């Protein structure tokens, strides 16, 4: 299960205490002070690791603390610095403190200092003076810093699936990727985003995100609302998954309502490159006519796509996806319109190649 938000407590280490000691050497009756300083407490860092893509590892591990600094030693030896705490997070993790965004961690291998460890205390060697030749005082180390933070992950996926509840998004991602989401015939089966790795061939693939179904008013927080719309903000291409079998709400109306919610939430999100998947085509009435009408609705010309092993074969592919033009994905037109069936795997194999070509 994908965990997208978690609260943890981070703490830097306490500085080690300074040492009270005096030189003890043969023939030296009253050796001077030689107490060393305490070691600094360990720091807390966040490090971005491209090999992890969830916050699931934080479940059950709430406290993350660096080690304390070691006490100062004799003969002016400084105590060892406390071991740093390195907190590994996936790319795209945002760290919130006191209700405000504190850190935005995007770049792989990036390491950011979050909390500095407490300073080690001074040993008694620092307190010798003309009037006090044998000081018996040393400083305590300074306390570390503790902070409660919230980690929030915006999915950084290549393809983001957008659709109403029960449109078949979870079935689709389980069919073409390694994701295994919960699937059932009722709305809001998906309660958290799912990530799936889609392997096209031995060398190519991409990451797909399935978010909980959008309902009207989602941009205002209804249903599962804004908390999940944010997950598709960083995806490269949107794939609208429409239920071609619905009689109460046609695919044109589904598309218009979904796009309206995206535009209300974020104009930038609504302007992302996109394509349309007409799911459940195997149980839809006259899918060819439906596909033609939808292409006309979007001012596109329906195509015969037998060469792509599509069955049914009517749909639309932008010329750029077929290598006729350079990939400039700033245009508003759809990149693809494809009928498919996630349940019976109709056209799902060809879909992998289409989605790969759609990526910038």
From Swiss-Prot:
Species for this entry: Helicobacter acinonychis (strain Sheeba)
Domain called Obg: residue spans: 1-156
Subcellular location: Cytoplasm
Cofactor requirement: Mg(2+)
Residues that, per the record, bind GTP: 163-170, 188-192, 210-213, 279-282, 341-343
Subunit organization: Monomer.
GO biological process: ribosome biogenesis
Binding sites annotated in the UniProt record for Mg(2+): 170, 190
InterPro entries linked to this entry: G_OBG, GTP-bd, GTP-bd_Obg/CgtA, GTP1-OBG_CS, GTP1_OBG_dom, GTP1_OBG_dom_sf, OBG_GTPase, P-loop_NTPase
Leading EC class: hydrolase
Gene Ontology cellular component annotations, sorted alphabetically: cytoplasm
PANTHER family for this protein: DEVELOPMENTALLY REGULATED GTP-BINDING PROTEIN-RELATED, MITOCHONDRIAL RIBOSOME-ASSOCIATED GTPASE 2
CDD domains: Obg
Stated family: Belongs to the TRAFAC class OBG-HflX-like GTPase superfamily. OBG GTPase family.
UniProt KW keywords: Cytoplasm, GTP-binding, Hydrolase, Magnesium, Metal-binding, Nucleotide-binding
GO MF annotation: an example: GTP binding
EC number: 3.6.5.-
Occurrences of domain OBG-type G (ranges): 157-360
Official protein name in the record: GTPase Obg
Function of the protein: An essential GTPase which binds GTP, GDP and possibly (p)ppGpp with moderate affinity, with high nucleotide exchange rates and a fairly low GTP hydrolysis rate. Plays a role in control of the cell cycle, stress response, ribosome biogenesis and in those bacteria that undergo differentiation, in morphogenesis control.
Annotated Pfam families: GTP1_OBG, MMR_HSR1
């Amino acid at each position: 299960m994908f965990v997208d938000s978690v609260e943890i407590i981070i703490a830097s280490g306490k500085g080690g205490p300074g040492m009270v000691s005096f030189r003890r050497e043969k023939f030296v009756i009253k050796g001077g002070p030689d107490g060393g300083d305490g070691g600094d407490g360990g720091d807390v860092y966040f490090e971005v690791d491209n090999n992890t893509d969830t916050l699931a590892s934080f479940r059950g591990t709430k406290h993350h603390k660096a080690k304390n600094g070691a006490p100062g030693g004799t003969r002016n030896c400084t105590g060892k610095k406390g071991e740093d705490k390195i907190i590994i997070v996936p790319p795209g993790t945002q760290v919130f403190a006191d209700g405000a965004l504190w850190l935005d961690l995007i770049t792989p291998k990036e390491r950011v200092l979050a909390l500095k460890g407490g300073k080690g205390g001074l040993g008694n060697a620092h307190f010798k003076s003309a009037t006090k030749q044998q000081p018996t005082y040393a400083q305590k180390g300074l306390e570390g810093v503790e902070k409660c933070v919230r980690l929030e992950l915006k999915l950084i996926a290549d393809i983001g699936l957008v659709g109403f509840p029960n449109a078949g998004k979870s079935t689709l991602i389980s069919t073409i990727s390694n994701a295994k989401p919960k699937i059932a015939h009722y709305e809001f089966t998906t309660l958290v985003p799912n990530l799936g790795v889609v392997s096209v061939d031995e060398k190519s693939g991409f990451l797909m995100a399935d978010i909980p179904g959008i309902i009207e008013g989602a941009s205002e927080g209804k249903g599962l609302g804004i908390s999940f719309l944010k997950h598709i903000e960083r995806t490269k291409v949107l794939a609208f998954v429409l239920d071609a079998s619905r009689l109460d709400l046609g695919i044109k109306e589904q598309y218009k309502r979904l796009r309206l919610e995206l535009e209300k939430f974020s104009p930038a999100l609504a302007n992302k490159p996109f394509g349309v998947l007409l799911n459940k085509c195997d149980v839809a009435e006259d899918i060819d006519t439906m596909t033609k009408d939808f292409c006309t609705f979007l001012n596109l010309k329906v195509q015969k796509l037998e060469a792509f092993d599509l069955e049914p074969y009517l749909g639309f592919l932008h010329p750029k996806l077929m290598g006729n033009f350079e990939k400039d994905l700033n245009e508003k037109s759809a990149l693809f319109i494809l009928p498919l069936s996630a349940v019976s795997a109709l056209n799902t194999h060809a879909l992998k190649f289409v989605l790969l070509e759609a990526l910038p």
